[in-house]
Amino acid sequence: MNWNGDKSIKMNLDKTGKSDKTGTTNKNSGIKPNVKYNDILSKLDKYKDENIVPMHMPGAKRNKELIELYMGDMGNPYEKDITEINGFDNMHNAETIIKDAFDEAAELYGADESWYLVNGSTAGNMSAICGVTHKNDVVIMARNCHISVYNAVILNELNPVYIYPEYDEEYGYYKGITLKEIKDIVDKYSSDHDRNDIKAVILTSPTYEGNVSDIKSIAEYLHQYNIPLIVDEAHGAHFNFSESFPQSAVKCGADIVINSVHKTLPSLTQTALIHINYGIVDVERIRRYWNIYQSTSPSYILMSSIARSLSIVKN
């Protein structure tokens, strides 16, 4: 066997599995795995066995009954972990089973188009922002946006104009953005610049603490000036499934909405969705960046997890 690195190392294993180098070997494989590589798994096993209530993501909360009832047939992921082979479509050029999954998600959320994200909402935010802007464009964004929004601003060399959401001193969190705050910042910018320079407004709603912005009124106002609204709704993937929740940004008229299905729905970590409403945005340009920011080896296990979690909430 050959390993190529700073130095070339050769190990000649005989039929018994013995090596001409020092160290222990396994008669079956010839090499004994380094136990240090299992430290992460061992720590996860210990955490699972301690029966700690998980007040954190993902949304399944390690609920044994939920997992057995709805996820049991997913089985051993290693047995189903594949790449783009015949009959299994291709996420980057979806035409059959994956295209059907996208269409089902769009129908469920009421979007014109929905696509899976296996690189988290991060990939969705970056695809959306880069897909509606060009170098040196102006965007209005809430100062409490996710770091992925800032990364997109940096990568596309954009000029951000910040909205500073009101801070609640009593509870220690930022409130949602109001229509008045949007109008004020647009008017302020337009007093010295061309309003047409504003290529997008980017908001986080709900916030991590659950505060929502007035998305419906904001979207209606911005659309008067042909300004697209991007909503990072990572923590609101569940909004669409009960009248007890705030209305989803998709149904409120936002142009692009990103949901982390792993945050509040029973899907695996780093799974998410991007939804698009037709009218203002260039769908194909967004798709181009969606392809750029997604892995070229998308996990079928993660995609299956998204499909299963949506099936659960639908039924």
PLM regions: where:
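N-terminal "arm"/small-domain region of PLP-dependent enzymes with the aminotransferase-like
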Residues: 2-21, 26-96
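Conserved N-terminal alpha-helix of the aminotransferase class I/II PLP-enzyme fold
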Residues: 77-121
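Conserved PLP-enzyme active-site core in the AAT-like
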Residues: 37-43, 51, 69-71, 93, ...
